[in-house]
């Protein structure tokens, strides 16, 4: 269903890089991601890429938090608005909320310290609706009408 997940954020001069990593790590299992860094003057660009079978698993924490925080309807709207012409799903998360362990969408990419940019690539562009239905299904009174099977959260559970 999902072939790749790419997370991108910037570390500003006023920020502690470890806190930025912690913010991202509160929402995503960074052990599943390959990390890339790039110096850009005073900024440092951090990119985390997860490809293959673990890509879906890497969204497990977000999957759980959307349900715990009861924000499936808002998430579904943001995900649908974030569908790109190439068939990926692009959305922004508030870095400060992530540091506190919460999902908060930074609409339009607006976040005081810059957002965590998330891009989810379905295996096929036509699978984009399946990905949205899995991550943020339609609801009635805030409860999912149906649930697509939740992924196992750890690689060892695949055995």
UniProtKB/Swiss-Prot annotation:
It holds the Pfam family RNA_binding. This is UPF0201 protein MK0399. Transmembrane segments: none annotated. Belongs to the UPF0201 family. InterPro entries: PAB1135-like (IPR002739), Ribosomal_uL5_dom_sf (IPR022803).
